[in-house]
């Protein structure tokens, strides 16, 4: 309401997104606290978490689509026309979007230390109804949940072995192609390992 009062509604960008799929932890962690306060913590158990992410596989803490494919809503009346898009975006794109819109520059140094340019591609072309050149690859890591997507191909590791899926033909990740395409699986898996090393991250 305040934005409307200021006459800035048409030129204000509002984004809403979820950070992961439904939470599979056991429910009633804080049964005596009603939902809402910071002290409350509501979860829905494995079964309902899986159902909540239908038709996608799995849930939060995994890098299957049920854990990482989430809603993203952007509202900017002066720029965005109502509609939907199937173009792929990622949380890393949010910073790049704001920097393009505002003209802000990412600092080359912070506290005297050189920085790496942050990953991400601006979502502004998508907001304007254009086709954006997609990411070459997108990477994920959460503890022992690992994945990298290249176009419509995606490798996922939930344990020791990498799995390969064609998201265009199989968005629910039910047909593991790793044995049929071992070279591609190994190629993408090595790309993830190289990225992980570059990030200086060690799996737990």
Regions found by a protein language model. Give the residues of each.
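Histidine-centered active-site microenvironments of extracellular/periplasmic hydrolases
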Residues: 2-75, 79
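C-terminal structured subdomain/cap of oxidoreductase catalytic cores
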Residues: 167, 177-185
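Loop/turn elements at helix/coil->beta-strand transitions in domains of secreted/extracellular proteins
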Residues: 8-14, 133-135, 150-153, 184
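C-terminal cap/loop subdomain of S1 sulfatases and analogous C-terminal strand-loop tails that border
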Residues: 38-65, 79-87, 91-168, 195-204
């Amino acid at each position: 309401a305040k934005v409307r009062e200021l006459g800035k509604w048409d030129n204000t960008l509002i984004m809403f997104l979820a950070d992961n799929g439904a939470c599979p932890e056991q429910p009633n962690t804080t049964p005596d606290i009603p939902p809402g306060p910071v002290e409350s913590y509501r979860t829905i158990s494995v079964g309902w978490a899986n159902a909540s992410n239908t038709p996608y596989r799995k849930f939060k803490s995994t890098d299957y689509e049920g854990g990482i494919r989430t809603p993203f809503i952007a509202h900017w009346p002066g720029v965005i026309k109502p509609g939907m898009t199937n173009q792929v975006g990622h949380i890393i794109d949010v910073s790049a979007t704001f920097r393009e819109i505002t003209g802000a520059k990412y600092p080359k140094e912070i506290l005297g230390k050189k920085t790496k340019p942050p990953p991400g591609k601006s979502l502004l072309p998508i907001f304007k109804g254009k086709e954006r050149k997609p990411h070459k690859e997108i990477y994920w890591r959460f503890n022992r949940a690992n994945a990298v997507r290249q176009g419509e191909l995606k490798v996922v590791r939930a344990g020791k072995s990498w799995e390969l899926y064609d998201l265009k033909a199989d968005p629910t990740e039910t047909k593991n192609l790793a044995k049929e395409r071992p070279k591609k699986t190994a190629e993408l898996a090595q790309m993830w390992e190289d990225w992980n090393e570059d990030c200086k991250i060690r799996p737990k």
